[in-house]
Amino acid sequence: MADGQMPFSCHYPSRLRRDPFRDSPLSSRLLDDGFGMDPFPDDLTASWPDWALPRLSSAWPGTLRSGMVPRGPTATARFGVPAEGRTPPPFPGEPWKVCVNVHSFKPEELMVKTKDGYVEVSGKHEEKQQEGGIVSKNFTKKIQLPAEVDPVTVFASLSPEGLLIIEAPQVPPYSTFGESSFNNELPQDSQEVTCT
């Protein structure tokens, strides 16, 4: 075999080209193994905050092999990229919140609007003469609103660091008329008095 036919120049004819991630019979389990142990033993977890421990000690959602990206509801939490292009749903009672870095734009150059279930953030610099040329910057970012958020309640604020913070409270769950989740009668020790 000539050196020109091998992907790497190696002068040992007994060496064969191999990919350890594809050729080995164990390659399918190479990155899947938990080795029968939790990621963190119990004695090391005493100092971890309560919110971090379940996230760090939970099992990996699926296999991750070269060239593969996990898809599913946990992909958002683990990789910061929402599955199916949606923003993550807020936790019950917490407002929906998204931050957009707009540090190179002035407040008067930014526009935030809601349309068809999306928040659209856009910014545009006027043309400026810089370093022997004309520079113009503009961007548009669309963020899909979760179903739990009313588009009318969306508001935005700009931090001193140049982060545009877009927030909206969750819509409270509606109950249908006649549902037994609430009582129509006033309690006997009520402070209300009927006026005559």
UniProtKB/Swiss-Prot annotation:
GO CC entries: cytoplasm; cytosol; nucleoplasm; nucleus; protein folding chaperone complex
Subcellular location field: Cytoplasm; Nucleus
Family statement drawn from the similarity comment of this UniProt entry: Belongs to the small heat shock protein (HSP20) family.
Biased composition (Polar residues): 177-196
Ranges annotated as spanning the membrane: none
Species: Homo sapiens (Human)
InterPro entries according to UniProt: A-crystallin/Hsp20_dom (IPR002068), Alpha-crystallin/sHSP_animal (IPR001436), HSP20-like_chaperone (IPR008978), HSPB8 (IPR043254), HspB8_ACD (IPR042790)
Key words, A-Z: Chaperone, Charcot-Marie-Tooth disease, Cytoplasm, Disease variant, Methylation, Myofibrillar myopathy, Neurodegeneration, Neuropathy, Nucleus, Phosphoprotein, Stress response
Disease implication from the record: Neuronopathy, distal hereditary motor, autosomal dominant 2: A form of distal hereditary motor neuronopathy, a heterogeneous group of neuromuscular disorders caused by selective degeneration of motor neurons in the anterior horn of the spinal cord, without sensory deficit in the posterior horn. The overall clinical picture consists of a classical distal muscular atrophy syndrome in the legs without clinical sensory loss. The disease starts with weakness and wasting of distal muscles of the anterior tibial and peroneal compartments of the legs.
Protein name stated in the entry: Heat shock protein beta-8
Cross-referenced PANTHER family: HEAT SHOCK PROTEIN BETA-8
PROSITE patterns tied to this protein: SHSP
Region listing for Disordered, in residue ranges: 176-196
